[in-house]
Amino acid sequence: MKSTLRISLKSGERIFINGAVLRVDRKVALEFLNDVTFLLENHVLQPEDANTPLRQLYFIAQMILINPEGKEQTLTMFRKSIVMLLSCFQDDEILAELKRIDAQVVSGRAFDALKAIRGLYPLEDRILNNQEMAPATIEQIRKEIAPWR
């Protein structure tokens, strides 16, 4: 990390830092002086909200940050999901971004990948609302992710 990172948390807010979950009891500012892997509570997707293919991919990717002990298993599931999504989506923008997201995760930049996945939600919503992806394909992806819920 080239510079320090400062974040503010509200009373009762949680943050996931290197796999640990912290809750603050008052408004607080944290300053990270070195490299750290963290995820803010408002970026954590709950299992019941992982109801589309990209949200399911996001859920898997966030587990890399939340549960570092299970990283290898999570990476295996992530790779399997990426391959499946690359074969299911036909939109060039999503396909290019999925390849970039895959490279980010492989290179240890899961936080950047989460941000990129969130950026694809509007495109995914359009595709799903216009039924550009077969319902059977969506169901197949849901079955693959089921063990992670």
UniProtKB/Swiss-Prot annotation:
GO terms for molecular function: mRNA 5'-UTR binding. InterPro entries: Flagellum_FlbT (IPR009967). One of its GO terms (biological process) is bacterial-type flagellum organization. Pfam families: FlbT. Keywords: Bacterial flagellum biogenesis, Repressor, RNA-binding. Belongs to the FlbT family. Has a post-transcriptional repressor function in flagellum biogenesis. Associates with the 5'-UTR of fljK mRNA and promotes its degradation. HAMAP family: FlbT. This is Probable flagellum biosynthesis repressor protein FlbT. The gene is flbT.
